[in-house]
Amino acid sequence: MASGIQPDAGQILNSLINSVLVVDDALAIHYANPAAQQLLAQSSRKLFGTPLPELLSYFSLNIDLMRESLAAGQGFTDNEVTLVIDSRSHILSLTAQRLPDDFILLEMAPMDNQRRLSQEQLQHAQQIAARDLVRGLAHEIKNPLGGLRGAAQLLSKALPDPALTEYTKVIIEQADRLRNLVDRLLGPQHPGMHITESIHKVAERVVALVSMELPDNVRLIRDYDPSLPELPHDPEQIEQVLLNIVRNALQALGPEGGEITLRTRTAFQLTLHGERYRLAARIDVEDNGPGIPPHLQDTLFYPMVSGREGGTGLGLSIARNLIDQHAGKIEFTSWPGHTEFSVYLPIRK
């Protein structure tokens, strides 16, 4: 190496874009580089001595597993750690190494945006494939169902004993029930009539409908951005989307009750389905219920997937389909005590 002035370790750590922490076995912070201070929104002086989990609303890291790996003399890596600070969710790749004097070095790197985008695209493709499969099956069910209903009607007219028509009545009623289920599985087949108006009109209709269903221990909060521009949309379809999500939130709260927040904001420079938009509307539905079980999160928008006993699992699948027809997207974050669905609708390129 050429001779000259060499940067010390502090200069190197200060210049890193990755967050670096030195913690003890209790995860109390003894050092935080500038990137970590920015991530945790605290100065190094305030961070010193504070256990890392106390700064976070949610931390998905398996701390016991990390300690076991370090105790065995091995490093530890988790390529997808979620942490939440002041309602801001971050997905990071975390690496841990044992240091002398029982300290632990934690390095946290933001998850690559391209990787996140690829995962979203893969999940979206899988959801479309599942939806197409269900639609194909629904069409196959619908044809013989019509024949079954028609035959039951003819049989009802031919039966001499009125008491026997009770059985054909049951067949017809159950055939109609199945047909309604199939129609819901198929969902809307064509884009609706789009008009340009404030999305808050739709939000207020949803509030009016849900308010009649609210128990006394549930509070519905409206947090609207008055500067949000008007945007082209089908009011009935967006109403159905928001109604499905808000009702899911209400059911998730259960008998314990809680809060549901309906929030609107303007999003800037957003990519939707490969198109870049200067402006988009973001509509959030947030609740403080128990959260979505981790085993359901990857398949939540698939047809027939539900975390509720007796649920059809169609509400979010239909909502995703309707938002796709608006060239928008739905995403969510969830951990115990917090679930938030965000609907993005394009305003202008």
From Swiss-Prot:
Q: Provide the PAS domain boundaries.
A: 5-78
Q: How is it modified after translation?
A: Autophosphorylated.
- Fetch the CDD domains from UniProt: HATPase_Glnl-NtrB-like, HisKA, PAS
Q: Does the keyword Transmembrane helix apply?
A: no
Question: Residues bearing Phosphohistidine?
Answer: 139
User: What's its catalytic activity?
Assistant: ATP + protein L-histidine = ADP + protein N-phospho-L-histidine
Keywords (alphabetical) are: ATP-binding, Cytoplasm, Hydrolase, Kinase, Nitrogen fixation, Nucleotide-binding, Phosphoprotein, Transferase, Two-component regulatory system
The primary site where this protein sits is cytoplasm
Which NCBIfam families does its entry note?
PRK11073.1
What protein name is recorded for this chain?
A: Sensory histidine kinase/phosphatase NtrB
Q: Which organism is it from?
A: Salmonella typhimurium (strain LT2 / SGSC1412 / ATCC 700720)
The encoding gene: glnL
